[in-house]
C-alpha cells in the first residue's frame, strides 16, 4: 500500500503544471540582472506564468523579435526605422530602466579613482593613446602614479546595445570617432580584444593587467572592477551613480511618443554622460490573445511595482512622466 501511494505521488509530481503559460524572450545583457529579478518575482505572484530570457545581446534580441521567434526582445538601442519596417508586425519600444556604462580598468599600482576626459577615452579606443602614463591621462589625475605600461583595449565581440551606448557617446564627443568608426551595436573596432557579453568583457578586464573596457555598472560592481569618472558636457567629472543617471535623463531631450531617445552626453551639470534607457521590444499583436494579455499585465506591473526593485541592482527607475506615458502605450499590446 505504501509503495502504491508513493508511486501515485511520483506520477503526480511528474505531470506538467496544468494551464501554465511560458513566454520566451531574448536580447540585451545590460539589463539582465534586473530582468532576471523581475521575471522571478512576477512568477511568485503568478505561478502559472513562466518567463524565460536569454541574454544574448541586443543585436540578437532585435533579430529574434523581428523574425517572430520569441515573444519579446530586449535592446539597449531602440530599433531603427528600417528595423521596424523589416519586422513582420508593429513592434513597441518600451523603456524599462536607466543604467550607466562605465570605463572599467585594471591598472597595476593605481589605487585611486581615475578620471577620464572624452578625448582620452576616444584616443584610447582609437589606438592614439597607447600608454597609461600618457599626458592625456596623467594631466587630469594629479597624485596618481601611472605605470609606463601598454594599454590593452577590451570591447564586445557580439552585437551589443552596451556597445551602441558607448559608441553613441564617443560619436557625440569625438568628430574623429564619428567619421571613422561611428555608432552601432557592432562596429569595426580600430583595435582591441573582444569579449562576449558584459560578463565576458568584465572577465577579460579582471584577467588582463593594463586593460580597459566598458561594461554596465552592475557588472563592474559585482566583479569588484574599478571604474572611472568621466568629464561631462558641463565640464564636471562625474562617477556613475543612480543620481548621475537620473540627472542625465532629466536634462535630456524631451521623450518622443515612440520612446526612441538617446541621453548620452546630456548637458546637466550633475549628469553622468554615458547613460541610457534600455528597452523591451514588444509585438503589439502577440501570437495568441493569452500571451498578449500576460505581456500587458507584466508590463503594467513592471512600470509600477517593478520599479521599486531597480536601485538595489544599481539601475535608475523610470521618471514618473515616462512611466505614465508608457501605461497608455501598453494598452496597445494584445
Segments predicted by a language model, with ranges:
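Sec/Tat signal peptide C-region and signal peptidase I cleavage site
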Residues: 11-19
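Flexible loop/hinge segments at secondary-structure junctions
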Residues: 19-334
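Positively charged n-region of N-terminal signal peptides that target proteins for export
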Residues: 1-4
Amino acid at each position: 500500500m505504501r509503495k502504491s501511494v508513493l508511486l501515485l505521488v511520483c506520477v503526480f509530481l511528474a505531470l506538467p503544471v496544468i494551464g501554465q503559460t511560458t513566454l520566451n524572450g531574448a536580447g540585451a545583457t545590460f539589463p539582465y540582472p534586473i530582468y532576471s529579478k523581475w521575471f522571478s518575482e512576477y512568477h511568485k505572484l503568478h505561478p502559472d506564468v513562466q518567463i524565460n530570457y536569454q541574454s544574448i545581446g541586443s543585436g540578437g534580441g532585435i533579430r529574434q523579435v523581428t523574425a517572430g521567434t520569441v515573444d519579446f526582445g530586449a535592446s539597449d538601442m531602440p530599433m531603427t526605422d528600417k528595423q521596424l519596417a523589416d519586422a513582420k508586425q508593429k513592434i513597441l519600444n518600451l523603456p524599462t530602466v536607466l543604467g550607466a556604462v562605465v570605463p572599467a580598468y585594471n591598472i597595476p599600482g593605481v589605487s585611486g579613482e581615475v578620471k577620464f576626459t572624452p578625448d582620452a577615452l576616444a584616443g584610447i579606443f582609437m589606438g592614439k593613446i597607447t600608454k597609461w602614463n600618457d599626458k592625456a591621462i596623467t594631466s587630469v589625475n594629479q597624485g596618481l602614479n601611472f605605470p609606463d605600461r601598454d594599454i590593452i583595449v577590451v570591447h564586445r565581440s557580439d552585437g551589443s546595445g552596451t556597445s551602441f551606448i558607448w559608441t553613441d557617446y564617443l560619436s557625440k564627443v569625438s568628430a574623429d570617432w564619428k567619421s571613422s568608426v561611428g555608432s552601432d551595436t557592432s562596429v569595426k573596432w580600430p583595435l582591441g580584444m573582444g569579449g562576449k557579453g558584459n560578463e565576458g568583457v568584465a572577465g577579460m578586464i579582471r584577467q588582463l593587467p593594463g586593460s580597459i573596457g566598458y561594461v554596465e555598472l552592475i557588472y563592474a560592481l559585482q566583479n569588484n572592477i574599478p571604474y572611472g569618472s568621466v568629464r561631462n558636457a558641463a565640464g564636471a567629472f562625474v562617477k556613475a551613480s543612480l543620481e548621475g543617471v537620473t540627472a542625465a535623463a532629466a536634462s535630456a531631450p524631451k521623450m518622443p511618443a515612440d520612446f526612441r531617445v538617446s541621453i548620452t552626453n546630456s548637458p546637466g551639470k550633475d549628469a553622468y554622460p554615458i547613460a541610457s534607457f534600455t528597452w523591451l521590444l514588444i509585438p503589439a499583436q502577440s501570437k495568441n490573445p493569452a500571451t498578449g494579455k500576460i505581456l500587458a499585465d507584466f508590463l503594467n506591473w513592471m512600470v509600477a511595482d517593478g520599479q521599486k526593485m531597480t536601485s538595489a541592482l544599481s539601475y535608475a527607475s523610470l521618471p514618473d512622466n515616462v512611466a505614465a506615458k508608457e501605461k497608455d502605450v501598453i494598452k496597445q499590446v494584445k
